[in-house]
Amino acid sequence: MVNTLPKPGIKTPSKETVLTPRFYTTDFETAANLDLSAQENELQAMLAEMRADYNRHHFVRDEAFEQSWEHIDGEARQAFIEYLERSCISEFSGFLLFKELSRKLKNRSPVLAEMFQLMARDEARHAGFLNKAMGDFKLSLDLATVTKTRTYTFFPIEWVLYTVYLSEKIGYWRYIIIFRHLEKHPENQFYPIFRYFESWCQDENRHGDIFKALLRSQPQLWNNWKARLWSRFFLLSVFATHTLTVHERSGFYKSLGLDATDFDLQVVRNTNETAGRAFPVMLNTEHPKFFPLLQRCAGYNLNISEIERSSQPKFVKLIRKLPLIAAIVWNLLMVYLIKPIDTEALRETVR
């Protein structure tokens, strides 16, 4: 008889939901045929920067980690472990995608292959550092098993460029906002990993800049009406996911001395502004209905989670959740229909 129980200290990954980090695969043939000539100089400069590996000595645990963490307990402990797990899975997802792209493109597009190899190096470093942090709480993720058991979602390479760009840039803003907040309020820095966020976020920023160059090298991804619609869709998808997730885990942000709603506003506003440098449009986050609609969705999502935790039969849960799901979809549609800001027109004005 085969023992299928997890080993002691090995954490069973959280159940996959719409909001959990996903694993992706893509069309490697299309990726190999991307014409990068329009951004060749920028990409070569970024490749040289990636080879320099400025953070190669950064992810080293120091003596601050060498202590008992039993004083972090109860809901705060659980919330922090969930944060570490989500972050680890997200970084590991990036590692797997970049590693596979590097392997598949090695003989077809060597510059792009090396770029993905170096980004995979960074993501693996991040995931390993986060998993070691989980070890301080007597848990860890079996990433080899996660690789085999996780569901993989296929995205065309064009979608990968949009979504990974946004993922890296929103990651940058999340890390730097937390770091700056804890610089001002060191009494809330309850674990040493947060001290690493300033240099850590620079990896995210560099990766985002690479994807910006890749995106701008493909005019069809920014110079037509379809690209504008897709840009709005992916911006809204990423921001809605962030808003719902942050409010789901408001306890973690409270433990850092952050208000979840205020943190979400800062991250979304800054990421949107940054995305305007790459995308043909950015969302109008200053519209009076923009954040209230997103926050309403977050409230509905909390109601759904409460229903899911109840002991009612699955059918009853589904009936109760359906109107809430419909309300989320409707409110997100209202956000999508808010007139966006034409960033290409702004670029022309600056010129």
UniProtKB/Swiss-Prot annotation:
Pathway: Porphyrin-containing compound metabolism; chlorophyll biosynthesis (light-independent). NCBIfam families: AcsF (TIGR02029), PRK13654.1 (NF010172). Catalyzes the formation of the isocyclic ring in chlorophyll biosynthesis. Mediates the cyclase reaction, which results in the formation of divinylprotochlorophyllide (Pchlide) characteristic of all chlorophylls from magnesium-protoporphyrin IX 13-monomethyl ester (MgPMME). It is an enzyme of class 1 (oxidoreductase). Keywords: Chlorophyll biosynthesis, Iron, Metal-binding, NADP, Oxidoreductase, Photosynthesis. GO terms for molecular function: iron ion binding; magnesium-protoporphyrin IX monomethyl ester (oxidative) cyclase activity. Its cofactor is Fe cation. Belongs to the AcsF family. One of its GO terms (biological process) is light-independent chlorophyll biosynthetic process. Its EC number is 1.14.13.81. This is Magnesium-protoporphyrin IX monomethyl ester [oxidative] cyclase 1. It catalyses: Mg-protoporphyrin IX 13-monomethyl ester + 3 NADPH + 3 O2 + 2 H(+) = 3,8-divinyl protochlorophyllide a + 3 NADP(+) + 5 H2O. Pfam families: Rubrerythrin (PF02915). InterPro entries: AcsF, Ferritin-like_SF, Rr_diiron-bd_dom.
